[in-house]
């Protein structure tokens, strides 16, 4: 049976066929003034088989959001997936996939050196008690150890 095409690009991806971890261009949108948004799927865990624990995922989100912007002003958004298997990272007007890979690798190394989770307090975070720096660093270490797999999605 053929599946209906969905409006959300990731819903059209066969989640059983992918091999995490990987980094793939998930979507590209061209604005009315010519700006282009590149949305990347940063998949950490194998869909429907494993997921990141929430405190580690939450801290990794904060660390990526803060530290990646030290390396590029083209970062629009970093969003965790509800399924807890990865993140979406959106870049503005940066078409080079290798630049995205370098940004991620550099930022993951920054995370390994981090001594605290940024904005990990009730004033700056909606669930400040739900963080794990060591958990985020474990995920960063895992991704860096599997760097050679990032470019192969299937």
Curated annotation (Swiss-Prot):
What sort of enzyme, by top EC class, is this?
Answer: lyase
UniProt-recorded name of the protein = S-ribosylhomocysteine lyase
Spell out the SUPFAM superfamilies in the cross-references: LuxS/MPP-like metallohydrolase
Q: Which domain of life is it from?
A: Bacteria
Kindly list any coiled-coil regions of this protein.
none
Q: InterPro entries in the record, alphabetically?
A: LuxS_sf (IPR037005), Metalloenz_LuxS/M16 (IPR011249), S-ribosylhomocysteinase (IPR003815)
Function as written in the Swiss-Prot or TrEMBL entry:
Involved in the synthesis of autoinducer 2 (AI-2) which is secreted by bacteria and is used to communicate both the cell density and the metabolic potential of the environment. The regulation of gene expression in response to changes in cell density is called quorum sensing. Catalyzes the transformation of S-ribosylhomocysteine (RHC) to homocysteine (HC) and 4,5-dihydroxy-2,3-pentadione (DPD).
> Its GO biological process terms?
quorum sensing
Q: Does the keyword Metal-binding belong to this entry?
A: yes
| Keywords carried by this UniProt record | Autoinducer synthesis, Iron, Lyase, Metal-binding, Quorum sensing
Query: What molecular function does GO assign, one term?
Result: iron ion binding
List of residues binding Fe cation:
58, 62, 125
Which reaction does this enzyme catalyse, per its entry? S-(5-deoxy-D-ribos-5-yl)-L-homocysteine = (S)-4,5-dihydroxypentane-2,3-dione + L-homocysteine
Can you tell me which family this protein belongs to?
Belongs to the LuxS family.
Q: Quote the Gene3D superfamilies the UniProt record gives.
A: S-ribosylhomocysteinase (LuxS) (3.30.1360.80)
The coenzyme or cofactor needed here is: Fe cation
Q: Which Pfam families match?
A: LuxS
Q: How, per the record, is the cofactor bound?
A: Binds 1 Fe cation per subunit.
Tell me, how does this one assemble? Answer: Homodimer.
Q: What is its EC number?
A: 4.4.1.21
């Amino acid at each position: 049976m053929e599946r209906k095409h969905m409006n959300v690009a990731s819903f059209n991806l066969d989640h059983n066929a992918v091999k995490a971890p990987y980094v793939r261009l998930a979507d590209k949108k061209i604005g009315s003034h010519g700006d282009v948004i590149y949305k990347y799927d940063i998949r950490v865990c194998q869909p429907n088989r494993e997921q990141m624990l929430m405190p580690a995922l939450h801290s990794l989100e904060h660390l990526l959001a803060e530290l990646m912007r030290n390396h590029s002003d083209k970062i629009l958004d970093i969003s965790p997936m509800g399924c807890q298997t990865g993140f979406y990272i959106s870049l503005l007007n940066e078409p080079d996939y290798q630049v995205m890979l370098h940004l991620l690798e550099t930022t993951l190394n920054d995370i390994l050196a981090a001594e605290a989770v940024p904005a990990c307090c009730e004033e700056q975070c909606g669930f400040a008690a739900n963080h794990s720096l060591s958990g985020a660093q474990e995920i960063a270490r895992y991704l860096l150890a599997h760097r050679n797999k990032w470019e192969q999605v299937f």
